[in-house]
A protein has these predicted regions:
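Generic structural signal for well-ordered alpha-helices
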Residues: 2, 65-69, 117-125, 185-189, ...
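Acidic, His- and aromatic-enriched active-site or binding-groove loops in soluble protein domains
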Residues: 42, 100-130, 158-174
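Structural recognition of the beta-strand scaffold that forms the well-ordered cores
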Residues: 11-15, 79-82, 132-136, 198-202, ...
């Protein structure tokens, strides 16, 4: 953050609370105060997953977002905020609501996930009034699963976020796997909302570390420019308003491997 400010560059970010994939992301004092959590791998005690519907967690999270806005609710410093951040990697899938089983789905799941999404999007919208807020349009948005066919309520959850003041983004551009990539459902959502709200793209592959050549699109190994072309084509189809080049190496790849785009 400090380096970006030295360079006079605005930043974009999401706040991740789930510890399954990265280690501790929610402070221990929140759990010490009584917030419920799941621990899917007991051998890694720091990898806790807070229950987003828990009132204690929500109380601390509300204080955090309010404090965050005091510093970052400024377009000079902030390009946009991905204001959901639940689930693995904060991508909005694999969201756990059962402390005993992070994958559990029951008769209350659809109600709880809608209530949580409504709460968190209204929270960010209350405090971030000067910078864009976005949500990942994921086929299993807010659900305990991570892939497969689209949940029938995902479309309405995207619409709910938009009604609360959000734009939309996807971090799977260029990925063509029908179970977890940027496929038919995602394209339909973009088509539904383009020209109505801004759309932001992020490429799904980090070409320096992901096996992008296994993608159904037939990207050639050793040819990251193939991935860049795939991302570009999907972005053009979606009519994106901004291309988020992700980590530093990805920015270098765009300029070195696909400058003509």
């Amino acid at each position: 953050v400090q380096k970006a400010r030295e360079l006079k560059l605005p930043i974009a970010f999401r706040v991740v609370v789930d510890g399954r994939d990265q280690g501790a992301n929610t402070p221990q004092f929140v759990y010490d105060a009584g917030a419920e959590y799941a621990m899917s791998e007991p051998k890694y005690p720091d990898r806790k997953t807070p229950m987003p519907q828990d009132p204690i967690f929500q109380r601390y999270y509300e204080k955090f977002v309010a404090a965050l806005a005091e510093e970052f609710n400024d377009p000079e410093y902030t390009s946009f905020i991905d204001g959901y951040g639940l689930g693995k990697w904060g991508e909005g899938h694999s969201v756990a609501y059962n402390k005993d089983d992070v994958s559990a789905v029951d008769e209350n799941t659809e109600t709880v996930k809608r209530e949580v999404l409504d709460w968190i999007t209204k929270l960010y919208a209350k405090h971030f009034t000067k910078v864009p807020l976005v949500i990942n349009y994921h086929r299993v948005l807010g659900h305990p699963t991570s892939q497969g066919t689209a949940n029938p309520n995902s479309e309405s959850l995207v619409a709910l976020a938009i009604s609360n003041g959000y734009c939309i983004r996807s971090d799977a551009f260029g990925m063509n796997n029908s179970s977890w990539g940027y496929s038919t459902w995602e394209k339909a959502i973009a088509a539904q909302w383009r020209y109505k709200v801004p759309i932001i793209m992020e490429g799904g592959y980090i070409v320096s570390s992901h096996s992008y050549w296994n993608d159904p699109a037939g990207y050639r190994q050793g040819h990251p420019e193939d991935v860049r072309q795939g991302e570009f084509d999907s972005s053009a189809e979606a009519r994106v308003n901004m291309m988020d080049f992700r980590v530093g190496q990805e920015t270098e790849s765009w300029f070195n491997d696909a400058f003509r785009l």
